[in-house]
């Protein structure tokens, strides 16, 4: 193992959203902004919510339509456009890009996939556990985030945590806040 003095520090963003699904701003602008200040990025579309609640509640129809409409756009050409642009911006040794996407889950908590292969397919799943099973044997991290969200409402369910090659880390800090402690300097925002 190299000594600490031989190691280099790299800066990146492994979970950046844009308007390809339901984030803000143009996808190309997201890559350009990252390229101007970071060493690596994964612009991350929202891909699925297998256990989306509220199907029987007419008051939540707009929420369901908002999410499922974005997932449909991703599957109807958006993902191919996303993969192509991710490959376009990847410059080995200069600026690295990763194909990734996010899945929501009420039961397991939200997760983000981060793929080594730049042509990684969008994996359909019925749950986070199903996703992890289908991803076995592939070079992909499936990492939990929103650590500070409430359990049962997309907050991480630690009973589902599996250490190993698929989940070598968890997201502790994002624009939602610092999830290390409920006493952190930056309170958690659930928007």
Predicted regions and their residues:
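Extended, charged catalytic domains and RNA/DNA-binding interfaces, predominantly
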Residues: 1-191
